Swiss-Prot record:
Site (Plays an important role in discriminating NADH against NADPH): 75
Active site per the UniProt annotation: 235 (proton donor)
Domain of life where this protein originates: Bacteria
Gene3D superfamilies: NAD(P)-binding Rossmann-like Domain
Gene Ontology molecular function, alphabetical: enoyl-[acyl-carrier-protein] reductase (NADH) activity; NAD binding; trans-2-enoyl-CoA reductase (NADH) activity
This protein's name: Enoyl-[acyl-carrier-protein] reductase [NADH]
Residues annotated for NAD(+) binding in this entry: 48-53, 74-75, 111-112, 139-140, 244, 274-276
Length: 399
């Protein structure tokens, strides 16, 4: 079939297998060009491995550190007449390139919040790797079924305490949109923490430790975003921020148990704002990202997922002098938070109108990166060619 982008709101409901493969190859080429990372992990579990930062971590571990990787994700395969998800095609491409390099790659498709998928993962580690020495936690999900109670929690993107006047960019109509977001109820806050907080990360590490599949001295990190004051009302001080603060709490107990396990470590890693399927769903992020791209590109400091994660590995996860803040988080977002960058973004934020969107922002760059997520708009891909949407992932365990 011939596959074209079909965008509905903040999601593209189609994905292109050849485009996704080219996108993965581009990230691999970046890591290969930057060169090997010293003292890197050799057996890595990536929870949330198919898109965005999780995929970038899997690529960096494999092609930067020479690691064998086991990836967990929840994606839909293509079938005749219907494309699969971009994460499915990304993972198929990753497997293909890892095999060419002689690297072990296995993946598990299913709900990472469930006990069943945790057990399948443990079994795969025991059978193939023995143990893992690094665990990356990069799940982005709008809902979670609690594995012990069966209760279904949904995350909510709302401020806490007071209503917030929100400025955003309607990406369909290409207009600036002002809206009012009502505050979250306590129940909505609790549910968001249940989905996006640190409980599942802790459950994963506890399960892996109990099963004896974490090597002594193993490290784990969960990815997060903090942002600056422009995004704080809706993000850090909102319902999602409550979940992110829960990560900061849960990491303390995880760090303690890993430290007792041969001197291991657990850290929250703070990464910059990028275009992902998760971030495009946040009302103000398309406008913020379009402005941020413009300012950072002009400064020559613009980075995407792979650049961020490669530097996180090289400088902090595997380096001798990690970028660490007072709370003990690893920081890779310092170029975004440069006061000069934030001041310029704030000034443009107040000036942007329907008439000057393309002048004051890099909305063109935002749209391009958004389509790239789904394998569209990639140089060298023939989008008029007939492609088979049914792409198999070798070494896949279906949960």
């Amino acid at each position: 079939m011939i596959i074209k982008p079909r965008v509905r709101g903040f999601i593209c409901v189609t994905a292109h297998p050849a485009g996704c493969e080219a996108n993965v190859k581009k990230q691999i080429d970046y890591v290969t060009t930057e060169g090997p990372i010293a003292n890197g992990p050799k057996r890595v579990l990536v929870i949330g491995a198919s898109t965005g930062y999780g995929l970038a971590a899997r690529i960096t571990a494999a092609f930067g550190c020479g690691a064998d990787t086991l990836g967990v994700f929840f994606e839909r395969p293509g079938e005749e007449g219907k494309p699969g998800t971009s994460g499915w095609y990304n993972s198929a491409a990753f497997h293909k390139f890892a095999a060419q390099k002689g690297l072990y790659a296995k993946s598990i498709n299913g709900d990472a919040f469930s006990d069943e998928i945790k057990q399948l993962t443990i079994d795969a580690i025991k059978q193939d790797l023995g143990q893992v020495d690094q665990v990356i936690y990069s799940l982005a999900s709008p809902r979670r079924t609690h594995p012990k109670t069966g209760e279904v929690f949904n995350s909510t993107l709302k401020p806490i305490g007071n209503a917030v006047n929100l400025r955003g960019l309607d990406t369909d109509k290409e207009v600036i949109k002002e809206s009012v977001l009502q505050p979250a109820t306590q129940s909505e806050i609790d549910s968001t923490v249940a989905v996006m907080g640190g409980e599942d990360w802790q459950m994963w590490i506890d399960a892996l430790l109990d099963a004896g599949v974490l090597a002594e001295g193993a490290q784990t990190t969960a990815f997060t975003y903090l942002g600056e004051k422009i995004t704080h009302d809706i993000y850090w001080n909102g319902s999602i921020g409550a979940a992110k603060k829960d990560l900061d709490q849960k990491v303390l107990a995880i760090r303690e148990s890993l430290a007792a396990h041969g001197g291991g470590d657990a850290r929250v890693s703070v990464l910059k704002a990028v275009v992902t399927q998760a971030s495009s769903a946040i009302p103000m992020m398309p406008l913020y990202l379009s402005l941020l791209f413009k300012v950072m590109k002009e400064k020559g400091t613009h980075e995407g997922c792979i650049e961020q994660v490669y530097s996180l590995y090289k400088d902090s996860l595997c380096g001798d002098s990690p970028h660490m803040d007072q709370e003990g988080r690893l920081r890779a977002d310092y170029k975004e938070l440069d006061p000069e960058v934030q001041n310029q973004v704030q000034q443009l934020w107040d000036q942007v109108t329907n008439d000057n969107i393309y002048l004051l922002t890099d909305f063109v760059g935002y749209k391009s990166e958004f389509l790239n997520l789904f394998g569209f708009g990639i140089d060298g891909v023939d989008y008029d060619a007939d492609v088979n949407p049914d792409v198999k992932i070798p070494n896949l365990i279906q949960g």
